Amino acid sequence: MTAALLPVIIILLFVLRQNLIVVLGVATAYAYWAFGDGVVSNIVVDAWDAANKDILLSIPLFILAGNIMSRGGMAARLIDLMKSLTAPIPGGLAIATILSCAAFAAVSGSGTVTLLAIGTLMYPALINAGYPKSFALGALCAAGTLGIVIPPSIPLILYGIMTQTSIGDLFIAGIGPALVLTFLMLVYAITRNFGHKEGNWDLEYVLRSLKNGIWALLMPIIILGGIYTGYFTATESAAVAVVYSIIVETFIHKEMKWATLYEVISETTKLLGSLFPVLMIALSLNVFLTYEEVPQNLVAWLSQRIDNPVTALLGINFFLLIIGCLIDIGSAILILAPMLGPIAYSQGIDPIHFGIIMVMNLEIGYLTPPLGLNLIIAMGIFKEKFWTVCKSTIPFLLIMLIGLMLVSFIPRISLFLIN
């Protein structure tokens, strides 16, 4: 009876729309009191021990780097480059939109930042070029989510922290699935807009755009190349990303003043003030659950009812798709990764592969009502009705579900670069 109250408390607090820190705080305190030694103050001790990790520094640093680039000129330069490359192709501007989102996601590491930075520039351009509003909205909302799986990805960092999985390997594993999703979106964009042609090939324009956008293109190469050649760790790569973005936007592009940089740092600091307490409580709960062998007991119970990896994958995918509709991706990873991970591992699913599957499921949640974050952001910045935005994403939701199934049941898509 005591154990059964814990999920009831969590669900009740979510129904009452309490902040995540309240939900996790109450759940953790109850768990320590009911199942531990009764000393609730041990939460602080366990949280401190669990949070004493260098890798946690990568989260604020990657967020800061993404915010700097979204306020600078990298987004516009990447868009210009993609437009120059796709001009002679039917549906060229649609292709440029998706490629710009993918490229900026590889620079910023954030889906919402990608939607804001690329969407504000490309949505008017698509409408003025005669593209259907439904396609423009859907393409930007869906392609904006690519930042969730393309490295450097904050959700992948969170998964790595909560499951003790190599973040560098997660970054590399995200490349294959990101390419699959991007390819599927491009195929749809071309077939949907085959009649549109924006212009002819202009080598001078391409070279000029490449020169202007080269610094943005170099960043993911430097970050991932540095990690996998051993020059720096995942944490150090985040610091490199911040320094690189400041140098490029301030001294090379000269599109960011010091006052603007101060504003960006201040805004990022406020965001982290709400993020880190939640993360520390989640880590404390993770320590407690591991000590009490809750994941191990859950695995033992489910192993008697799940007889093969296919059943496990289908069940986990379905569960995570539902969760993605109701809970934001960070909260879902903090709460569920330590619980679902051991279940997947017990069925022979690689931890790296499962991390990609989990993030892709929750990525789809960005496009599903009632709490789809990209839907809400698009409604605000594009001044459209919520259900208009929702309907525009339906074709892309189907595309992303196809991509999810391919990645789930063909592990080589995630693991071939690592292996």
Language model features: what each stretch is:
Residues 1-419:
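Alpha-helical transmembrane segments of multi-pass membrane transport proteins
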